[in-house]
Amino acid sequence: MTYTVRTYGCQMNVHDSERIAGVLEDEGYVKSGSDDADVVVLNTCAVRENADNRFYGNLGQLLQKKNNGRIRQIAVGGCLAQKDRHKIFEKAPWVDVVFGTHNLGSLPALLRRSRHNKTAEIEIKDFLETFPSSLPVRRESNYSAWVSISVGCNNTCTFCIVPSLRGKERDRRPGDILAEISALVSEGVLEVTLLGQNVNTYGVEFGDRSAFASLLRKAGAIEGLERLKFTSPHPAAFTSDVIDAMHDTQAVLPQLHMPLQSGSDRILRAMRRSYRAGKFLKIISEARNKIPNIAITTDIIVGFPGETEEDFQDTLNLVAEVRFASAFTFQYSPRPGTPAASMPNQIPGDIVQERYERLLDLQNRIALEENRKLIGKEVELLVTVGGRKDSMLDNRYTGRTPCGRLVHFSCLHQLRPGDFATVKIIYAAPYHLIGDNALTVRRTPAGDVWIQKNDTRSAQLVSLGMPRIR
Protein backbone atom coordinates (compact mmCIF):
# COMPACT_ATOMS: atom_id res chain seq x y z
CA MET A 1 0.00 0.00 0.00
CA THR A 2 1.15 3.55 -0.68
CA TYR A 3 1.11 6.47 1.75
CA THR A 4 1.67 10.20 1.85
CA VAL A 5 2.06 12.52 4.84
CA ARG A 6 0.92 16.15 4.73
CA THR A 7 2.47 18.32 7.42
CA TYR A 8 1.09 21.50 8.98
CA GLY A 9 2.85 23.68 11.54
CA CYS A 10 6.22 23.79 13.25
CA GLN A 11 9.54 21.95 13.07
CA MET A 12 8.28 19.51 15.70
CA ASN A 13 5.61 18.38 13.26
CA VAL A 14 8.09 18.14 10.40
CA HIS A 15 10.22 15.77 12.47
CA ASP A 16 7.15 13.88 13.70
CA SER A 17 6.15 13.38 10.06
CA GLU A 18 9.53 11.77 9.43
CA ARG A 19 8.74 9.36 12.26
CA ILE A 20 5.24 8.70 10.91
CA ALA A 21 6.77 7.87 7.52
CA GLY A 22 9.32 5.66 9.26
CA VAL A 23 6.78 3.55 11.15
CA LEU A 24 4.66 3.15 8.01
CA GLU A 25 7.59 2.03 5.87
CA ASP A 26 8.65 -0.32 8.65
CA GLU A 27 5.24 -1.96 8.15
CA GLY A 28 5.73 -2.28 4.39
CA TYR A 29 4.01 0.89 3.15
CA VAL A 30 5.61 2.63 0.16
CA LYS A 31 5.78 6.40 -0.20
CA SER A 32 3.55 7.70 -2.98
CA GLY A 33 5.01 9.85 -5.71
CA SER A 34 1.99 12.19 -5.59
CA ASP A 35 -0.44 13.76 -3.12
CA ASP A 36 -2.80 10.82 -3.63
CA ALA A 37 -2.12 7.48 -1.96
CA ASP A 38 -3.88 4.50 -0.42
CA VAL A 39 -3.33 6.13 2.97
CA VAL A 40 -3.21 9.92 3.46
CA VAL A 41 -1.92 11.07 6.85
CA LEU A 42 -2.53 14.67 7.96
CA ASN A 43 -0.12 15.78 10.71
CA THR A 44 -1.89 18.84 12.08
CA CYS A 45 -1.19 22.06 13.96
CA ALA A 46 -3.39 23.75 16.58
CA VAL A 47 -1.40 26.90 17.31
CA ARG A 48 -3.49 29.28 15.19
CA GLU A 49 -7.08 29.35 14.02
CA ASN A 50 -6.19 29.60 10.34
CA ALA A 51 -4.38 26.25 10.62
CA ASP A 52 -7.64 24.69 11.88
CA ASN A 53 -9.63 26.19 9.03
CA ARG A 54 -7.12 25.08 6.40
CA PHE A 55 -7.07 21.56 7.78
CA TYR A 56 -10.85 21.11 7.75
CA GLY A 57 -10.99 22.61 4.27
CA ASN A 58 -8.45 20.07 3.03
CA LEU A 59 -10.43 17.26 4.66
CA GLY A 60 -13.41 18.25 2.54
CA GLN A 61 -11.32 17.98 -0.62
CA LEU A 62 -10.12 14.52 0.40
CA LEU A 63 -13.72 13.25 0.68
CA GLN A 64 -14.24 13.52 -3.06
CA LYS A 65 -11.00 11.66 -3.75
CA LYS A 66 -11.99 8.94 -1.30
CA ASN A 67 -15.39 8.58 -2.95
CA ASN A 68 -13.63 8.26 -6.32
CA GLY A 69 -11.41 5.48 -5.00
CA ARG A 70 -8.18 7.47 -5.25
CA ILE A 71 -7.74 7.28 -1.46
CA ARG A 72 -8.56 4.29 0.76
CA GLN A 73 -7.92 5.66 4.25
CA ILE A 74 -7.47 9.06 5.90
CA ALA A 75 -5.61 9.39 9.20
CA VAL A 76 -5.34 12.55 11.30
CA GLY A 77 -2.60 13.11 13.87
CA GLY A 78 -0.73 15.98 15.49
CA CYS A 79 -1.77 18.73 17.87
CA LEU A 80 -5.22 19.36 16.40
CA ALA A 81 -6.01 15.65 16.72
CA GLN A 82 -4.84 15.74 20.33
CA LYS A 83 -7.10 18.77 20.94
CA ASP A 84 -10.25 17.99 18.94
CA ARG A 85 -10.29 14.18 19.25
CA HIS A 86 -13.85 12.94 18.57
CA LYS A 87 -14.85 16.34 17.13
CA ILE A 88 -12.89 15.41 14.00
CA PHE A 89 -15.24 12.48 13.34
CA GLU A 90 -18.23 14.76 13.98
CA LYS A 91 -17.03 17.30 11.42
CA ALA A 92 -15.57 14.76 8.98
CA PRO A 93 -17.08 11.28 9.43
CA TRP A 94 -15.10 10.03 6.42
CA VAL A 95 -11.88 10.10 8.49
CA ASP A 96 -10.73 6.57 9.36
CA VAL A 97 -8.13 7.09 12.11
CA VAL A 98 -7.36 9.78 14.70
CA PHE A 99 -4.16 9.51 16.76
CA GLY A 100 -2.34 11.92 19.04
CA THR A 101 1.08 13.42 19.66
CA HIS A 102 2.05 10.79 22.25
CA ASN A 103 1.46 7.61 20.24
CA LEU A 104 2.83 7.99 16.72
CA GLY A 105 3.92 4.37 16.72
CA SER A 106 0.30 3.17 17.04
CA LEU A 107 -0.67 4.37 13.56
CA PRO A 108 -0.05 1.13 11.57
CA ALA A 109 -2.10 -0.92 14.05
CA LEU A 110 -4.93 1.63 13.99
CA LEU A 111 -5.00 1.56 10.19
CA ARG A 112 -5.12 -2.25 10.16
CA ARG A 113 -7.89 -2.29 12.76
CA SER A 114 -9.93 0.26 10.82
CA ARG A 115 -9.65 -1.74 7.60
CA HIS A 116 -10.52 -5.01 9.35
CA ASN A 117 -13.43 -3.69 11.42
CA LYS A 118 -14.59 -1.21 8.78
CA THR A 119 -14.96 1.40 11.55
CA ALA A 120 -13.27 4.62 12.53
CA GLU A 121 -10.52 4.19 15.11
CA ILE A 122 -9.27 6.72 17.65
CA GLU A 123 -6.42 6.46 20.12
CA ILE A 124 -5.32 9.54 22.07
CA LYS A 125 -2.95 9.24 25.01
CA ASP A 126 -2.50 12.04 27.51
CA PHE A 127 1.04 11.14 28.47
CA LEU A 128 4.17 10.16 26.55
CA GLU A 129 4.98 6.53 27.34
CA THR A 130 8.27 6.21 25.45
CA PHE A 131 10.42 8.90 23.87
CA PRO A 132 9.58 8.97 20.13
CA SER A 133 13.27 8.80 19.18
CA SER A 134 12.92 5.03 19.52
CA LEU A 135 10.70 5.00 16.40
CA PRO A 136 12.10 4.46 12.89
CA VAL A 137 12.57 7.65 10.88
CA ARG A 138 12.37 8.31 7.14
CA ARG A 139 14.43 11.45 6.57
CA GLU A 140 13.85 13.44 3.40
CA SER A 141 17.24 15.17 3.40
CA ASN A 142 20.60 13.57 2.69
CA TYR A 143 22.56 16.42 4.25
CA SER A 144 20.48 17.87 7.11
CA ALA A 145 18.63 16.22 10.00
CA TRP A 146 16.48 17.09 12.99
CA VAL A 147 17.53 15.52 16.28
CA SER A 148 15.00 15.79 19.09
CA ILE A 149 16.52 16.46 22.52
CA SER A 150 13.27 17.02 24.41
CA VAL A 151 9.51 17.03 23.97
CA GLY A 152 6.87 19.02 25.80
CA CYS A 153 7.11 22.32 27.65
CA ASN A 154 6.93 23.44 31.29
CA ASN A 155 6.09 27.08 30.49
CA THR A 156 2.60 28.52 30.92
CA CYS A 157 2.39 31.26 28.29
CA THR A 158 -1.19 32.52 28.30
CA PHE A 159 -1.54 32.47 24.49
CA CYS A 160 -0.11 29.00 23.90
CA ILE A 161 -1.97 25.71 23.73
CA VAL A 162 1.11 23.55 23.06
CA PRO A 163 1.90 22.45 26.66
CA SER A 164 -1.59 21.02 27.06
CA LEU A 165 -1.15 19.04 23.84
CA ARG A 166 2.52 18.03 24.04
CA GLY A 167 2.70 17.59 27.81
CA LYS A 168 5.40 18.44 30.33
CA GLU A 169 9.03 18.53 29.24
CA ARG A 170 10.73 15.16 28.81
CA ASP A 171 14.46 15.07 28.11
CA ARG A 172 16.53 12.47 26.29
CA ARG A 173 19.78 11.36 27.84
CA PRO A 174 22.86 13.03 26.31
CA GLY A 175 24.40 9.71 25.31
CA ASP A 176 21.37 8.78 23.22
CA ILE A 177 21.44 12.14 21.44
CA LEU A 178 25.16 11.99 20.69
CA ALA A 179 24.85 8.41 19.44
CA GLU A 180 22.08 9.47 17.04
CA ILE A 181 24.15 12.37 15.72
CA SER A 182 27.19 10.11 15.23
CA ALA A 183 25.05 7.61 13.31
CA LEU A 184 23.66 10.37 11.11
CA VAL A 185 27.12 11.71 10.32
CA SER A 186 28.26 8.21 9.37
CA GLU A 187 25.41 8.21 6.82
CA GLY A 188 26.60 11.47 5.26
CA VAL A 189 24.63 14.08 7.23
CA LEU A 190 26.57 17.34 7.60
CA GLU A 191 24.08 19.56 9.42
CA VAL A 192 22.06 18.79 12.54
CA THR A 193 19.37 20.89 14.21
CA LEU A 194 18.77 20.11 17.88
CA LEU A 195 15.04 20.30 18.42
CA GLY A 196 12.96 21.04 21.49
CA GLN A 197 10.05 23.20 22.59
CA ASN A 198 12.50 25.01 24.89
CA VAL A 199 15.99 23.69 24.24
CA ASN A 200 17.85 25.72 26.86
CA THR A 201 15.91 24.12 29.72
CA TYR A 202 17.23 20.77 28.51
CA GLY A 203 18.49 18.80 31.50
CA VAL A 204 15.84 19.95 33.96
CA GLU A 205 14.43 16.44 34.12
CA PHE A 206 17.72 14.96 35.32
CA GLY A 207 18.85 17.97 37.35
CA ASP A 208 21.66 19.39 35.19
CA ARG A 209 21.18 23.10 34.43
CA SER A 210 24.32 23.24 32.27
CA ALA A 211 23.31 20.22 30.20
CA PHE A 212 22.44 22.12 27.02
CA ALA A 213 25.71 24.03 26.81
CA SER A 214 27.57 20.78 27.47
CA LEU A 215 25.54 19.03 24.76
CA LEU A 216 26.44 21.73 22.23
CA ARG A 217 30.14 21.28 22.94
CA LYS A 218 30.04 17.48 22.75
CA ALA A 219 27.87 17.36 19.64
CA GLY A 220 30.03 19.97 17.93
CA ALA A 221 33.11 17.83 18.55
CA ILE A 222 31.74 14.88 16.55
CA GLU A 223 34.07 14.39 13.60
CA GLY A 224 32.37 15.04 10.26
CA LEU A 225 29.58 17.24 11.63
CA GLU A 226 30.07 20.60 9.91
CA ARG A 227 26.99 22.55 10.98
CA LEU A 228 25.11 22.46 14.28
CA LYS A 229 21.98 24.52 15.04
CA PHE A 230 19.19 24.51 17.61
CA THR A 231 15.62 25.69 17.99
CA SER A 232 13.94 27.11 19.93
CA PRO A 233 15.29 28.67 23.11
CA HIS A 234 13.34 30.78 25.61
CA PRO A 235 14.75 34.13 26.81
CA ALA A 236 13.76 33.51 30.44
CA ALA A 237 16.07 30.50 30.80
CA PHE A 238 18.81 31.51 28.36
CA THR A 239 22.22 31.68 30.02
CA SER A 240 25.73 32.87 29.21
CA ASP A 241 27.17 29.36 29.14
CA VAL A 242 25.14 28.64 25.98
CA ILE A 243 26.60 31.71 24.25
CA ASP A 244 30.08 30.64 25.38
CA ALA A 245 29.50 27.16 23.94
CA MET A 246 28.33 28.68 20.65
CA HIS A 247 31.45 30.84 20.51
CA ASP A 248 33.87 28.06 21.44
CA THR A 249 32.41 25.30 19.24
CA GLN A 250 33.33 25.68 15.58
CA ALA A 251 30.47 23.58 14.26
CA VAL A 252 27.79 25.69 15.98
CA LEU A 253 26.53 28.19 13.43
CA PRO A 254 26.44 31.95 14.11
CA GLN A 255 22.66 32.16 14.23
CA LEU A 256 20.25 32.50 17.14
CA HIS A 257 16.47 32.35 17.03
CA MET A 258 15.26 34.14 20.16
CA PRO A 259 11.45 34.53 20.39
CA LEU A 260 10.53 38.04 21.57
CA GLN A 261 6.69 37.95 21.22
CA SER A 262 6.36 41.59 22.39
CA GLY A 263 8.60 44.53 23.20
CA SER A 264 6.21 45.76 25.89
CA ASP A 265 6.92 44.70 29.48
CA ARG A 266 3.23 45.06 30.28
CA ILE A 267 2.23 42.69 27.49
CA LEU A 268 5.05 40.25 28.30
CA ARG A 269 3.68 40.10 31.84
CA ALA A 270 0.17 39.42 30.52
CA MET A 271 1.62 36.73 28.26
CA ARG A 272 3.33 35.21 31.32
CA ARG A 273 6.64 35.17 29.46
CA SER A 274 8.85 35.40 32.64
CA TYR A 275 11.27 37.96 31.15
CA ARG A 276 11.15 41.62 30.21
CA ALA A 277 12.54 43.66 27.34
CA GLY A 278 15.69 44.51 29.29
CA LYS A 279 16.57 40.83 29.78
CA PHE A 280 15.99 40.19 26.08
CA LEU A 281 18.25 43.06 25.04
CA LYS A 282 20.96 41.87 27.43
CA ILE A 283 20.97 38.43 25.76
CA ILE A 284 21.25 39.98 22.30
CA SER A 285 24.05 42.31 23.42
CA GLU A 286 26.07 39.48 24.97
CA ALA A 287 25.59 37.26 21.92
CA ARG A 288 26.78 39.99 19.55
CA ASN A 289 29.74 40.92 21.75
CA LYS A 290 30.99 37.32 21.74
CA ILE A 291 29.87 36.36 18.20
CA PRO A 292 30.00 39.58 16.12
CA ASN A 293 28.70 37.98 12.89
CA ILE A 294 25.71 36.29 14.53
CA ALA A 295 22.30 36.59 12.84
CA ILE A 296 19.41 37.07 15.28
CA THR A 297 15.88 36.01 14.30
CA THR A 298 12.69 36.11 16.33
CA ASP A 299 8.93 35.54 16.70
CA ILE A 300 6.52 38.43 17.35
CA ILE A 301 2.79 38.41 18.10
CA VAL A 302 0.76 41.48 17.10
CA GLY A 303 -2.57 42.32 18.70
CA PHE A 304 -2.39 40.41 21.97
CA PRO A 305 -5.43 41.23 24.17
CA GLY A 306 -5.06 44.63 25.79
CA GLU A 307 -2.20 45.75 23.53
CA THR A 308 -2.30 49.55 23.27
CA GLU A 309 -0.65 51.73 20.66
CA GLU A 310 2.02 52.50 23.25
CA ASP A 311 2.65 48.79 23.80
CA PHE A 312 2.94 48.23 20.08
CA GLN A 313 5.32 51.18 19.76
CA ASP A 314 7.53 49.50 22.37
CA THR A 315 7.70 46.49 20.06
CA LEU A 316 8.58 48.64 17.04
CA ASN A 317 11.28 50.42 19.03
CA LEU A 318 12.84 47.16 20.16
CA VAL A 319 12.77 45.74 16.63
CA ALA A 320 14.51 48.88 15.37
CA GLU A 321 17.13 48.59 18.11
CA VAL A 322 17.90 44.88 17.71
CA ARG A 323 17.71 44.81 13.89
CA PHE A 324 16.66 41.19 13.42
CA ALA A 325 17.89 39.36 10.32
CA SER A 326 14.32 38.09 9.96
CA ALA A 327 11.20 37.80 12.06
CA PHE A 328 8.25 35.43 12.04
CA THR A 329 5.36 37.80 12.69
CA PHE A 330 1.88 36.62 13.62
CA GLN A 331 -1.48 38.20 14.26
CA TYR A 332 -2.76 37.04 17.64
CA SER A 333 -5.16 34.12 17.29
CA PRO A 334 -7.27 33.20 20.35
CA ARG A 335 -7.11 29.49 21.13
CA PRO A 336 -9.97 28.02 23.19
CA GLY A 337 -8.68 26.71 26.49
CA THR A 338 -5.89 29.26 26.86
CA PRO A 339 -6.10 32.10 29.43
CA ALA A 340 -5.60 34.75 26.75
CA ALA A 341 -8.70 33.65 24.85
CA SER A 342 -10.95 34.85 27.69
CA MET A 343 -9.04 38.04 28.49
CA PRO A 344 -10.89 41.36 28.14
CA ASN A 345 -9.94 43.97 25.56
CA GLN A 346 -9.55 41.67 22.56
CA ILE A 347 -8.17 43.86 19.76
CA PRO A 348 -10.39 44.47 16.68
CA GLY A 349 -9.15 42.78 13.53
CA ASP A 350 -8.67 45.99 11.54
CA ILE A 351 -6.37 47.43 14.21
CA VAL A 352 -4.38 44.19 14.39
CA GLN A 353 -3.99 44.16 10.61
CA GLU A 354 -2.82 47.78 10.50
CA ARG A 355 -0.22 47.17 13.22
CA TYR A 356 0.89 43.95 11.56
CA GLU A 357 1.54 45.77 8.28
CA ARG A 358 3.55 48.48 10.05
CA LEU A 359 5.69 45.85 11.73
CA LEU A 360 6.23 44.04 8.43
CA ASP A 361 7.26 47.28 6.71
CA LEU A 362 9.82 48.00 9.42
CA GLN A 363 11.23 44.48 9.50
CA ASN A 364 11.45 44.23 5.71
CA ARG A 365 13.39 47.48 5.60
CA ILE A 366 15.79 46.30 8.31
CA ALA A 367 16.27 42.89 6.66
CA LEU A 368 17.14 44.54 3.35
CA GLU A 369 19.62 46.92 4.97
CA GLU A 370 21.29 44.06 6.85
CA ASN A 371 21.48 41.89 3.74
CA ARG A 372 23.02 44.70 1.70
CA LYS A 373 25.97 44.67 4.10
CA LEU A 374 26.92 41.30 2.59
CA ILE A 375 27.23 42.56 -0.99
CA GLY A 376 30.80 42.03 -2.19
CA LYS A 377 31.59 39.47 0.50
CA GLU A 378 32.47 35.84 -0.11
CA VAL A 379 30.40 33.25 1.76
CA GLU A 380 30.44 29.47 1.91
CA LEU A 381 27.05 27.94 1.18
CA LEU A 382 25.62 24.54 1.95
CA VAL A 383 23.85 23.61 -1.30
CA THR A 384 20.20 22.80 -0.61
CA VAL A 385 17.34 21.35 -2.61
CA GLY A 386 15.89 24.20 -4.69
CA GLY A 387 12.27 24.97 -5.46
CA ARG A 388 12.32 24.06 -9.16
CA LYS A 389 12.96 20.48 -10.18
CA ASP A 390 14.96 21.53 -13.26
CA SER A 391 17.06 24.18 -11.53
CA MET A 392 20.13 21.96 -11.04
CA LEU A 393 20.07 20.91 -14.69
CA ASP A 394 20.24 24.61 -15.64
CA ASN A 395 23.18 25.24 -13.30
CA ARG A 396 21.07 27.28 -10.89
CA TYR A 397 21.34 26.46 -7.22
CA THR A 398 20.21 27.49 -3.78
CA GLY A 399 22.27 27.45 -0.59
CA ARG A 400 22.39 28.65 3.00
CA THR A 401 25.09 30.77 4.57
CA PRO A 402 26.39 29.83 8.05
CA CYS A 403 24.11 32.54 9.48
CA GLY A 404 21.09 31.00 7.74
CA ARG A 405 20.55 33.41 4.85
CA LEU A 406 19.15 32.06 1.59
CA VAL A 407 21.35 32.56 -1.49
CA HIS A 408 20.58 31.81 -5.14
CA PHE A 409 23.63 31.35 -7.37
CA SER A 410 24.99 29.73 -10.52
CA CYS A 411 27.78 27.24 -11.02
CA LEU A 412 29.37 25.91 -14.20
CA HIS A 413 29.92 22.55 -12.52
CA GLN A 414 27.15 20.23 -11.46
CA LEU A 415 26.57 20.37 -7.71
CA ARG A 416 24.64 18.02 -5.45
CA PRO A 417 22.52 18.96 -2.42
CA GLY A 418 24.93 18.66 0.49
CA ASP A 419 27.98 19.99 -1.36
CA PHE A 420 29.56 23.32 -0.39
CA ALA A 421 30.15 26.27 -2.71
CA THR A 422 31.84 29.61 -2.08
CA VAL A 423 30.27 32.59 -3.86
CA LYS A 424 30.51 36.38 -3.87
CA ILE A 425 27.25 38.17 -3.04
CA ILE A 426 26.20 40.58 -5.81
CA TYR A 427 22.58 41.44 -4.92
CA ALA A 428 20.41 41.66 -1.81
CA ALA A 429 16.66 41.52 -1.22
CA PRO A 430 14.96 41.44 2.20
CA TYR A 431 14.81 37.65 2.42
CA HIS A 432 17.28 36.32 -0.12
CA LEU A 433 20.63 37.10 -1.68
CA ILE A 434 22.09 36.42 -5.12
CA GLY A 435 25.63 35.19 -5.58
CA ASP A 436 27.88 35.26 -8.63
CA ASN A 437 29.13 32.03 -10.21
CA ALA A 438 30.64 29.76 -7.58
CA LEU A 439 34.31 30.51 -6.94
CA THR A 440 35.14 27.17 -5.33
CA VAL A 441 33.29 23.91 -4.79
CA ARG A 442 33.76 21.31 -2.05
CA ARG A 443 32.30 17.85 -2.62
CA THR A 444 30.95 15.99 0.40
CA PRO A 445 29.73 12.52 1.43
CA ALA A 446 26.23 14.02 1.65
CA GLY A 447 26.39 14.79 -2.06
CA ASP A 448 27.45 11.21 -2.75
CA VAL A 449 24.41 9.98 -0.82
CA TRP A 450 22.17 12.23 -2.91
CA ILE A 451 23.58 10.63 -6.06
CA GLN A 452 22.81 7.15 -4.74
CA LYS A 453 19.18 8.14 -4.09
CA ASN A 454 18.57 9.72 -7.48
CA ASP A 455 18.38 8.56 -11.06
CA THR A 456 21.28 7.37 -13.19
CA ARG A 457 21.06 10.32 -15.58
CA SER A 458 21.58 12.83 -12.77
CA ALA A 459 24.46 10.76 -11.44
CA GLN A 460 26.19 10.79 -14.82
CA LEU A 461 25.75 14.54 -15.15
CA VAL A 462 27.20 15.20 -11.74
CA SER A 463 30.02 12.69 -11.63
CA LEU A 464 31.83 14.29 -14.58
CA GLY A 465 32.33 17.53 -12.68
CA MET A 466 32.57 19.36 -16.01
CA PRO A 467 30.65 22.32 -17.46
CA ARG A 468 27.56 21.34 -19.41
CA ILE A 469 27.80 21.58 -23.19
CA ARG A 470 24.84 23.44 -24.67
UniProtKB/Swiss-Prot annotation:
Binding site for [4Fe-4S] cluster 1: C10, C45, C79
Enzyme class, UniProt record, top EC level: transferase
The keyword rRNA processing appears for this protein: no
Family according to the record: Belongs to the methylthiotransferase family. MiaB subfamily.
EC numbers on record: 2.8.4.3
Free-text comment on the cofactor: Binds 2 [4Fe-4S] clusters. One cluster is coordinated with 3 cysteines and an exchangeable S-adenosyl-L-methionine.
Function: Catalyzes the methylthiolation of N6-(dimethylallyl)adenosine (i(6)A), leading to the formation of 2-methylthio-N6-(dimethylallyl)adenosine (ms(2)i(6)A) at position 37 in tRNAs that read codons beginning with uridine.
UniProt xrefs under InterPro entries: Elp3/MiaA/NifB-like_rSAM, Methylthiotransferase, Methylthiotransferase_CS, Methylthiotransferase_N, Methylthiotransferase_N_sf, MiaB_methiolase, rSAM, rSAM_horseshoe
The protein's name: tRNA-2-methylthio-N(6)-dimethylallyladenosine synthase
Domain Radical SAM core: 139-369
Organism: Tropheryma whipplei (strain Twist) (Whipple's bacillus)
Residues in TRAM domain copies: 372-439
Keywords of the record: 4Fe-4S, Cytoplasm, Iron, Iron-sulfur, Metal-binding, S-adenosyl-L-methionine, Transferase, tRNA processing
PROSITE patterns for this protein: MTTASE_N (PS51449), MTTASE_RADICAL (PS01278), RADICAL_SAM (PS51918), TRAM (PS50926)
Domain MTTase N-terminal: 1-116
Cofactors named for this entry: [4Fe-4S] cluster
Subcellular location: Cytoplasm
Reactions accelerated catalytically: N(6)-dimethylallyladenosine(37) in tRNA + (sulfur carrier)-SH + AH2 + 2 S-adenosyl-L-methionine = 2-methylsulfanyl-N(6)-dimethylallyladenosine(37) in tRNA + (sulfur carrier)-H + 5'-deoxyadenosine + L-methionine + A + S-adenosyl-L-homocysteine + 2 H(+)
GO cellular component, as recorded: cytosol
Assembly and oligomerization: Monomer.
Domain of life: Bacteria
Pfam family, one: UPF0004
Residues that, per the record, bind [4Fe-4S] cluster 2: C153, C157, C160
MF term (GO), any: N6-isopentenyladenosine methylthiotransferase activity
Major localization listed first in the record, in broad terms: cytoplasm
